[in-house]
């Protein structure tokens, strides 16, 4: 170590001062072995030795270069992995081919190592080991100087508050102080008042030569601090702060400040925290907090809206097709089947009408001559006998019309045009009574649509007040005109037994129609679609276990879900019809099991309208892109 008085202070200023001083170098190497990588320090001195041998022309330089490469730079045996490969590759090529290296062969590696050691030096001078070693060197001067000790008295006399005593050391060799627990307790007050806080003592251990200073602590630190401040009651002009500072500077001439190497980190204004001490800083902080809160509120509102839409979709368990088929009407009416309710009503009405005497008497029958002799001809009603079975519906219709041909003049003419009730029968239209025309139309229409006709579509609603009830037809031919539930519920052959009147039937139909119209959201659309869509006569409770979930996610990332009856595999056209999606312009990707098992699922693009869709986890899920 150099003999200069402040050589140890240069250790913190530069790396070169540490590398040129043996004491600092040993300390730096010890710190590297404990906290970092010491091999880069060895490489630095090995490169310096190679350069010196090259300048002196020694033949040992080739062997040294091989050793440096094998120990530090080789990709297999080297331990300096941080050096870039493009610095090490040219050196390895020359050594493998036996080419002598030039003087500056390791210059690039040397510059990289120096930069690395310089960064390590910045951390080293901040460590506790360096500060402790620096204090030890400071406490061992080569030429001891007289010590100045300021004895601080606890007496209340202000004139003797600061008394200086000078002691000269008789020998240059000092004995180490025994820091026992008792000695530390005795000097605790002096150490606290001299150095202020315990953090300072931890960073800088107490010196063997007491430092002359004045207690400049706050008024609230301790009770004894007031006796060392200029505001004490017994203080006078000679003990002012300026006088004490001058005395300290005069008595402590060899005091030097320990340099601190702080790395300056460039930071932008955006990285700086808000200055709450200024109005602008507080305003900026409040604006930033307001923006974050608004973004959070927007997210909360969006999540609530999404949950509300999902709940609405879950509540709507059936699609528009189910509503057209009458499922929603059954739900609104309490789950009562419409046909069963109508049948019960007709039975009750027919029972009431059969118990009353008929006010409308029909004309005389073909056998009225025999009954007039018995005196019963005035109240007799005409009831045609059932016709014999025929092979075709045309024979049944013609036979049925033949029995009623004598009453053709008593039937009201039809009020509707031929456009409303087109018939496919080749017989003449004016050969039929009105109720046979309408009943035949409804039966044929029901056959063409494969839908059973409603129970009130025959005798109970088609004949007028002055007409007769149709004759009961055979059960074997369900498609004959006039064959329905109500036509077989009563017997028209007895005296006093009458079918329901036209007025009662039409009034019950009007009541039922009004009630049914109120229960449906769109009566006109249902009536128009009922001619093309088969009507489902099933209870809702029976179909809940046979439902499948359909869903898709659109471009707005909002899922749309529906539950439909599952009757088998579904095509792409049926899937689009359930959601009323357009036929073209959109690509549907359906979830299916992953083929290679690398993902939970995969997306399958389906374009053909007749392709069967895959079922993934019990549902058919799609994404529109």
Swiss-Prot record:
Residues 162-177, 218-229 have a biased composition (Polar residues). Residues 14-135 form the RGS domain. Pfam families: DIX (PF00778), RGS (PF00615). Transmembrane segments: none annotated. Residues 273-282 have a biased composition (Basic and acidic residues). GO terms for molecular function: beta-catenin binding; molecular adaptor activity; protein kinase binding; ubiquitin protein ligase binding. This is Axin-like protein pry-1. It comes from Caenorhabditis briggsae. The lineage of its organism: Eukaryota, Metazoa, Ecdysozoa, Nematoda, Chromadorea.
């Amino acid at each position: 170590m150099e003999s200069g008085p402040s050589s140890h202070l240069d250790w913190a200023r530069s790396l070169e001062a540490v590398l040129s001083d043996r004491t600092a170098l040993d300390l730096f190497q010890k710190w590297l072995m404990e906290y970092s990588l010491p091999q880069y320090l060895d490489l630095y001195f090995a490169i310096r030795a190679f350069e010196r041998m090259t300048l002196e022309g020694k033949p040992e330089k080739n062997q040294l270069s091989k050793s440096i490469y094998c120990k530090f730079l080789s990709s297999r045996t080297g331990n300096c992995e941080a050096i870039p490969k493009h610095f090490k590759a040219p050196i390895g090529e020359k050594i493998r081919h036996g080419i002598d290296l030039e003087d500056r062969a390791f210059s690039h590696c040397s510059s990289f190592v120096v930069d690395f050691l310089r960064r390590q030096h910045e951390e080293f001078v901040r460590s506790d080991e360096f500060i402790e070693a620096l204090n030890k060197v400071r406490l061992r001067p080569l030429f001891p100087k007289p010590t100045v000790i300021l004895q601080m008295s606890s007496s209340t006399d202000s004139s003797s508050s600061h008394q200086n005593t000078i002691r000269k050391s008789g020998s240059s060799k000092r004995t180490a102080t025994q820091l026992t627990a008792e000695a530390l307790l005795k000097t605790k007050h002096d150490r606290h008042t001299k150095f202020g806080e315990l953090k300072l003592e931890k960073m800088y251990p107490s010196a063997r030569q007491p430092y002359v200073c004045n207690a400049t602590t706050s008024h609230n630190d301790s009770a004894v601090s007031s006796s060392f401040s200029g505001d004490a009651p017994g203080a006078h002009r000679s003990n002012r702060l300026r006088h004490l500072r001058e005395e300290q500077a005069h008595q402590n001439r060899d005091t030097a400040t320990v340099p601190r190497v702080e790395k300056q980190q460039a930071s932008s204004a955006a990285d700086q925290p808000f200055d709450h001490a200024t109005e602008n800083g507080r305003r900026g902080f409040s604006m930033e907090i307001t923006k974050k809160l608004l973004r959070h509120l927007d997210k909360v509102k969006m999540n609530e809206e999404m949950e509300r839409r999902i709940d609405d979709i879950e509540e709507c368990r059936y699609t528009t097709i189910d509503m057209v088929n009458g499922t929603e009407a059954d739900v609104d009416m309490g789950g009562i089947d419409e046909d069963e309710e109508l049948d019960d009503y007709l039975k009750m009405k027919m029972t009431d009408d059969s118990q009353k005497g008929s006010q409308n008497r029909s004309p005389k029958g073909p056998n009225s001559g025999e009954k007039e002799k018995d005196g019963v001809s005035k109240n007799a009603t005409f009831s045609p006998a059932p016709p014999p079975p025929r092979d075709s519906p045309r024979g049944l219709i013609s036979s049925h019309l033949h029995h009623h041909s004598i009453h053709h003049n008593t039937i009201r003419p039809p009020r509707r045009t031929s456009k409303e009730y087109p018939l496919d029968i080749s017989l003449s239209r004016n050969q039929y009574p009105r109720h046979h025309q309408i009943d035949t139309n409804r039966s044929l229409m029901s056959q063409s649509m494969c839908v059973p006709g409603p129970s009130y579509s025959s005798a109970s609603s088609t004949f007028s007040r002055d007409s007769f009830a149709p004759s009961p037809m055979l059960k074997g031919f369900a498609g004959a005109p006039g064959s329905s539930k109500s036509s077989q519920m009563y017997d028209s052959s007895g005296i006093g037994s009458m079918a329901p009147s036209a007025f009662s039937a039409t009034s019950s139909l009007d009541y039922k129609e009004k009630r049914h119209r109120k229960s449906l959201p769109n009566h006109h659309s249902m009536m128009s679609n009922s001619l093309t869509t088969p009507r489902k006569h099933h209870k809702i409770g029976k179909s809940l276990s046979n439902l499948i979930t359909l869903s898709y996610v659109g471009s707005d990332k909002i899922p749309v879900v529906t539950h439909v009856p599952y009757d088998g595999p579904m095509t792409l056209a049926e899937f689009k019809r359930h959601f009323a999606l357009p036929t073209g312009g959109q690509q549907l990707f359906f979830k299916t099991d992953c083929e290679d098992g690398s993902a939970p699922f995969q997306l399958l693009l389906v374009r053909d309208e007749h392709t069967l869709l895959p079922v993934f986890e019990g549902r058919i899920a799609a994404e529109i892109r």
